[in-house]
């Protein structure tokens, strides 16, 4: 066969280019790579060196946050679909290829944070981050600081991803090289009330600070229920296996797992430590007022020799195995103990109640994360979702929905977290919200959510098809549909229309504790919200002379991101925390005259004010929660 005849035959070796392009959004990057290696036809069609379509789709998958409500579904009123990040990067780097844009986002985007310092929530403390300068810290004295008032880079992995800047050797396959570096490439950052959640390109999930809950209950077990805790059970069983010593003088008991000022107790197993000649297990040992041991009433032996009593030094650490297991579940970023990796309970067979392979580990990979006030929700590569919602554990709980269709036919398309509840959009089911779940019992691998289905949100093609949704508190959900002419609110089992005097078709919404942001195809508006009730009189068009494409809100402050990669902030900076990122408090009030004191340490900035980044720096993603703000920032070369 001639070369010409061969080329003519090649299209018969696979699907047409249009069909392949249409299927790319439904394939993982590994699937696409494998498909490209199937034969010459697919290898040419999916050319990793020259295909714009391929790298554009790979960019969406890696950095588009398509599985959370950070980005809306593509609606009838949407133009060509673009994520916020790609809009900014195409504006800033119009001449780069999609492969170059992908590599720029992967290697040059660094995580910056600012705001309240308490509990290391920013990913660092005042003394642990070398990037901090004195003028960036708010506080009454050099030794006592409240917060960080300017965007500051967070200490992250210090390996070749820091210096590589997307330069590959001629022999390297760029996608494979990026995959190798995936553990250190930040794909998404989400902010809760007391921490940031950081998702890497490889699917690892991290959380900043010492607590994501702040000691507050999230949408976890109902009432006073508690999840099964294997660590607590192991400790209880270990301590029970040691005998207790009863004093004849006052009848008090002492657990022998404590430390004694004497010889280490004899025997290598707790059940034989006080048994002469391997007798049956001693349950109680009685000590008279002089300290001499005597047989416990009803005991099987007449006395315990004095040599079996501890007489010097503490016994061996009976908790060593538990401590080893806990250490395996607490992995920090190298060189930064203020950012820890987060795992699901299902990663550890220990939680199943089985004794075998206690140290084994199942590495679950996540593709999306969304944060609430004291909890967060993540989705894995198999379309399972996990909720970190308890003050008692740092491990996520797998969530299931009783009496709903299988994920195989009705997958979860997006996840979201409100102030005190979780929500997701399930194909042909609609919006599903819950603020409680069952407690996990021993041997169980998941918990059932106590959910509500938002009525009339299951349409997948028509006018009522959901385009975007936003979560407030107590299962209150705002949403918009394909028509784009109405804002809907679901609360207490009912859907209501919120009538507003706005211009344009609604295409995107954002909400937090006390605010609601509406995007139309021509304008951007803000509204105040109190206990789910919209203050219609507070409707305000954003006064920013740039096109705003993303907005994030904390408790009382808001940050906007424009298509040019600029940041603007306004609202209340509580307790001198620095969350607005506009500099020292005195400068905001006395020099720039853009804010006013409210009380002793609160500052209000009414008009959106530009956050000054270093020259040639742009922001590609912003998040906020509580009293802190975070952003992914790139230096333009």
UniProtKB/Swiss-Prot annotation:
Bias kind Low complexity: ranges: 289-305
UniProt effect for mutating residue 35 to P: In saf1-6; impairs the interaction with SKP1
Keywords assigned by UniProt, alphabetized: Phosphoprotein, Repeat, Ubl conjugation pathway
GO CC list: cytoplasm; SCF ubiquitin ligase complex
Modified residues annotated as Phosphoserine in this record: 16, 266
Record keyword rRNA processing present: no
Record-linked InterPro entries: F-box-like_dom_sf (IPR036047), Ran_GTPase-activating (IPR051553), RCC1/BLIP-II (IPR009091), Reg_chr_condens (IPR000408)
Biological or metabolic pathway of the protein: Protein modification; protein ubiquitination
Region span, Disordered: 242-315
Annotated ranges, domain F-box: 14-63
Biological process, per Gene Ontology: protein ubiquitination; SCF-dependent proteasomal ubiquitin-dependent protein catabolic process; ubiquitin-dependent protein catabolic process
Biased composition (Polar residues): 244-260
Residues in RCC1 repeats: 109-202, 565-635
Gene3D superfamilies in UniProt: Regulator of chromosome condensation 1/beta-lactamase-inhibitor protein II
Superkingdom, taxonomy of origin: Eukaryota
Effect of residue 372 to V: In saf1-1; impairs the protein stability
Outcome reported for the amino acid change (mutating residue 263 to K): In saf1-4; impairs the protein stability
Function noted in UniProt: Substrate recognition component of a SCF (SKP1-CUL1-F-box protein) E3 ubiquitin-protein ligase complex which mediates the ubiquitination and subsequent proteasomal degradation of target proteins. Targets AAH1 adenine deaminase for proteasome-dependent degradation upon entry into quiescence. Targets also URA7.
Subunit (UniProt): Interacts with AAH1, SKP1 and CDC53. Component of the SCF(SAF1) complex containing CDC53, SKP1, HRT1 and SAF1.
Protein name (record): SCF-associated factor 1
Organism encoding this protein: Saccharomyces cerevisiae (strain ATCC 204508 / S288c) (Baker's yeast)
């Amino acid at each position: 066969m001639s070369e010409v005849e061969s080329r003519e035959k090649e299209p018969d070796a696979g699907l047409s280019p249009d069909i392949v392009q249409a299927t790319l959004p439904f394939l993982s990057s590994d699937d696409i790579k494998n498909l490209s290696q199937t034969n010459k036809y697919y290898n040419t069609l999916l050319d990793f060196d020259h295909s714009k379509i391929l790298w554009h789709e790979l960019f969406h998958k890696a950095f588009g946050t398509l599985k959370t409500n950070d980005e809306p579904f593509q609606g009838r009123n949407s133009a060509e679909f673009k994520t916020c990040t790609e809009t900014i990067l195409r504006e800033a780097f119009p001449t780069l290829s999609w492969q170059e844009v992908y590599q720029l986002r992967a290697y040059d985007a660094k995580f910056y944070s600012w705001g309240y310092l308490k509990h290391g929530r920013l990913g660092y403390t005042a003394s642990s981050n070398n990037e901090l300068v004195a003028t960036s810290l708010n506080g009454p004295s050099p030794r006592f600081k409240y917060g960080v008032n300017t965007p500051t880079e967070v200490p992250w992995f210090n390996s070749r991803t820091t210096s590589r800047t997307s330069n590959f050797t001629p022999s390297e396959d760029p996608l494979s090289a990026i995959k190798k570096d995936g553990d250190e490439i930040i794909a998404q950052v989400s902010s809760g009330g007391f921490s940031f959640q950081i998702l890497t390109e490889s699917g690892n999930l991290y959380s900043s600070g010492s607590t994501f809950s702040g000691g507050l209950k999230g949408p976890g077990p109902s009432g006073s229920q508690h999840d099964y805790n294997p660590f607590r059970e192991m400790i209880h069983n270990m301590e029970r296996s040691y005998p207790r010593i009863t004093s004849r003088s006052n009848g008090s008991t002492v657990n022998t797992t404590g430390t004694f000022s004497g010889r280490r107790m004899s025997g290598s197993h707790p059940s034989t430590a006080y048994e002469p000649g391997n007798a049956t297990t001693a349950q109680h040992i009685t000590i008279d007022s002089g300290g001499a041991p005597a047989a416990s009433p009803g005991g099987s032996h007449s006395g315990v020799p004095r040599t079996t009593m501890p007489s010097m030094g503490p016994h061996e650490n009976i908790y060593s195995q538990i401590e080893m297991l806990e250490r395996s579940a607490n992995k920090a970023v190298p060189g930064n103990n203020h950012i820890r990796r987060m795992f699901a309970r299902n990663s550890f067979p220990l939680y199943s109640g089985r004794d075998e392979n206690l140290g084994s580990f199942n590495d679950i990979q996540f593709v999306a994360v969304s944060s609430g006030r004291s909890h967060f929700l993540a989705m894995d590569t198999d379309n399972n979702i996990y909720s970190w919602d308890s003050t008692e554990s740092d491990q996520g709980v797998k969530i299931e929905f009783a009496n709903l269709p299988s994920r195989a036919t009705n997958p979860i398309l997006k996840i979201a977290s409100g102030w005190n509840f979780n929500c997701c959009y399930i194909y042909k089911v609609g919006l599903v919200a819950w603020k409680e779940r069952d407690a996990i019992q021993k041997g169980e691998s998941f918990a059932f959510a106590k959910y509500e289905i938002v009525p009339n949100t299951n349409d997948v093609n028509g006018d009522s098809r959901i385009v975007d949704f936003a979560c407030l508190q107590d299962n209150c959900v705002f949403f918009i549909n394909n028509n784009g002419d109405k804002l809907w609110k679901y609360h207490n089992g009912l859907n209501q229309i919120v009538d507003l005097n706005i211009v344009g078709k609604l295409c995107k919404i954002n909400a937090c504790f006390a605010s609601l942001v509406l995007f139309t195809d021509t304008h951007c508006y803000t509204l105040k919200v109190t206990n789910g009730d919209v203050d219609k009189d507070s409707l305000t068009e954003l006064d920013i002379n740039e096109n705003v494409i993303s907005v994030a809100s904390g408790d009382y402050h808001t940050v906007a991101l424009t298509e040019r990669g600029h940041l603007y902030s306004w609202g209340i900076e509580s307790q001198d925390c620095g969350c607005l990122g506009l500099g020292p408090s005195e400068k905001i009030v006395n020099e720039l005259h853009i804010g006013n004191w409210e009380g002793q340490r609160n500052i209000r900035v009414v008009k959106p004010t530009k956050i000054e980044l270093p020259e040639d720096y742009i922001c590609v993603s912003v998040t906020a929660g509580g009293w802190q703000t975070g952003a992914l920032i790139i230096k333009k070369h």
